[in-house]
Design a protein with these regions (language model features):
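Solvent-exposed interaction patches of small proteins and small membrane subunits
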Residues: 1-128
Length: 128
């Protein structure tokens, strides 16, 4: 059962990355299309949530502590030697982006979305 949860989260992350890449198509102008923009942002959000779920699952399974936030789950993985601090910081930044996108704290900066697509989708893959 535990491996099934892990495999499911990894599959979700991979599916989201593929969807983002398909919709973006290596063309920043695709971010000007609101439908494509929504699809991309939603899939970044889903990949982030699946990464958080995966981190929480590993933390619970290995009894690494009780994280008080999703960001802290990544910190506990670093402390346990299961994740590099550099990758943890990148994933925690994704959590910040997710919070902006989900809770609409401020409008989403499309330059940040483009940078995530072009430079940071691999961070999700490295985590899986």
């Amino acid at each position: 059962m535990k491996n099934e949860v892990i495999l499911n989260k990894i599959s979700t992350i991979e599916r989201c990355i593929k969807r983002i890449q398909d919709v973006y198509g290596n063309d920043p102008e695709n971010l000007e299309d609101f439908t494509k923009q929504d699809s991309i942002i939603l899939n970044i959000q889903r990949a982030c949530e699946a990464s958080i779920d995966l981190a929480m699952h590993i933390v619970a399974g290995k009894k690494l502590g009780l994280p008080q936030s999703s960001r802290e789950a990544f910190d506990l993985l670093v402390t346990a030697g299961l994740l590099s601090a550099d990758l943890a910081n990148k994933l925690k930044a994704m959590v910040g982006f997710r919070n902006i996108a989900v809770h609409d704290y401020q409008s989403v900066n499309l330059d940040i979305v483009r940078q995530i697509i072009e430079k940071h989708l691999t961070d999700f893959k490295l985590f899986t």
